[in-house]
């Protein structure tokens, strides 16, 4: 019997890095609502009293970026100066240029088309950059996500809910969770440690906060059978968390990549997700790789599946596809690659088409994870390839 501990974290929408991600995706959605052929690479920085939105955007429409940024911060809950950040009085600075023509020429006309080798219309669109992207799925939870990150996200969603619904009216927007799960022979058996840090009003008694967070946030979220008398709880372990949000830390887009994906259980290619239109394979191929891995696991071809796909800038066809099933595969990993090539088109244009990615759907996934979202209907979470994979694999 092999036992090990594994830990993942999540952050609330009021965390400074997530404010930045959410603003970047709100800008993308606002543009896509008017021009779904736009090229968007939007980055954001938030600090004390300041929002800076910068990037390369090519579009025929007009979007009031400062207004989008302020409304996003308002939705999060930073509406008063005493919270450390105020959507109405903070400065908003923008620095926007068009997409580099050197990049655009590779996206607009893929290598295959330039060489006269394009097989169809999909190969007119090249990848927006080089790089490798990973997708992952596991059978250990109903949403096919690792349990540590699934529970960590559930805790931060609940933390935001009890604040917004005024169940715990003394909470403020910034917050984090961390969950350590004990595994026995690869299966989760218990929760070992729960960490919650939440911004709060300065006059609240810490003992009261800890008791109420335990009863209204942790216990309703984590299944009772996963908790025992050895489970440890650290709730605001420093003893005070009044200064938070951009006043406490500078936030940047792309700083919470592991929170956005699989909580460290799978590898990561290094590319951020938020603020990018789907011609950027950092985003679209990461979604496609999750789509592939989830369908492989749901089809019973493996209990765990990690898919890597890689691209060259300006080239439509992936330069490589690889699979790792960690010894859980019902068929060989080589056979899985063959099945993936047969049933999934991983060229950027095909990913955008098949997952219907030219829509304003991105702000919703900018917080609480891009994958395994039972609260959202996401195209990359569909299980529409299961039967075909099973049939082709002979299961």
UniProtKB/Swiss-Prot annotation:
Its EC number is 2.5.1.6. ATP binds at residues 15, 174-176, 240-241, 249, 255-256, 272, 276. Coiled coil: none annotated. It catalyses: L-methionine + ATP + H2O = S-adenosyl-L-methionine + phosphate + diphosphate. It is found in: Cytoplasm. Gene3D superfamilies: 3.30.300.10. GO terms for cellular component: cytoplasm. PROSITE patterns: ADOMET_SYNTHASE_1 (PS00376). InterPro entries: ADOMET_SYNTHASE_CS, S-AdoMet_synt_C, S-AdoMet_synt_central, S-AdoMet_synt_N, S-AdoMet_synthetase, S-AdoMet_synthetase_sfam. Pfam families: S-AdoMet_synt_C, S-AdoMet_synt_M, S-AdoMet_synt_N. Keywords: ATP-binding, Cytoplasm, Magnesium, Metal-binding, Nucleotide-binding, One-carbon metabolism, Potassium, Transferase. Binds 2 divalent ions per subunit. Mg(2+) binds at residue 17. L-methionine binds at residues 99, 249, 280. K(+) binds at residue 43. The keyword Ion transport does not apply. This is S-adenosylmethionine synthase. It comes from Moorella thermoacetica (strain ATCC 39073 / JCM 9320). The gene is metK.
């Amino acid at each position: 019997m092999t036992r090990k501990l594994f830990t993942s974290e999540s952050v609330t929408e009021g965390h400074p890095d997530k404010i930045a991600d959410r603003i970047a995706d709100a800008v993308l959605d606002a543009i896509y609502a008017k021009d779904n052929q736009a090229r968007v690479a939007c980055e954001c920085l938030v600090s004390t009293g300041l929002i800076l939105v910068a990037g390369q955007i090519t579009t025929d429409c007009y979007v009031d970026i400062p207004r989008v940024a302020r409304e996003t911060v308002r939705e999060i809950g930073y509406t008063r100066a005493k919270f450390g950040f105020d959507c109405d009085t903070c400065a908003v600075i923008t620095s926007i240029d068009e997409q580099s023509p050197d990049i655009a020429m590779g996206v607009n006309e893929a290598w295959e088309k330039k060489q006269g080798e394009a097989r169809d219309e999909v190969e007119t669109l090249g990848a927006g950059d080089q790089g490798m992207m990973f997708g992952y799925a596991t059978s250990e939870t109903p949403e096919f996500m690792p349990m540590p990150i699934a529970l960590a996200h559930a805790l931060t969603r609940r933390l935001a809910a009890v604040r917004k619904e005024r169940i715990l009216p003394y909470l403020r927007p910034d917050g984090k969770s961390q969950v350590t799960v004990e595994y026995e022979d690869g299966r989760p058996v218990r929760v070992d440690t729960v960490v919650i840090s939440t911004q709060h009003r300065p006059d609240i008694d810490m003992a009261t906060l800890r008791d109420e967070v335990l009863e209204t946030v942790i216990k309703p979220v984590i299944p009772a059978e996963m908790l025992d008398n050895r489970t440890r709880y650290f709730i605001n372990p420093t003893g005070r968390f009044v200064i938070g949000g951009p006043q406490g830390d500078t936030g940047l887009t792309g700083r919470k990549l592991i929170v956005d994906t699989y909580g460290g259980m799978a590898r990561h290619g290094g590319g951020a997700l938020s603020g990018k239109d789907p011609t950027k394979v950092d985003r679209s191929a990461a979604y496609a790789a999750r789509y592939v891995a989830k369908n492989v696991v749901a089809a019973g071809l493996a209990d765990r599946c990690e898919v890597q796909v890689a691209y060259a800038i300006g080239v439509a066809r992936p330069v490589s596809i690889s699979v790792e099933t960690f010894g859980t595969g019902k068929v060989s990993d080589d056979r899985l690659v063959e099945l993936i090539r047969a049933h999934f088109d991983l060229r950027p244009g095909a990913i955008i088409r098949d997952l219907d990615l030219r829509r304003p759907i991105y702000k919703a996934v900018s917080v609480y994870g891009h994958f395994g979202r039972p609260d959202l209907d996401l195209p990359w979470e569909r299980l529409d390839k299961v039967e075909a994979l099973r049939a082709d694999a002979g299961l």
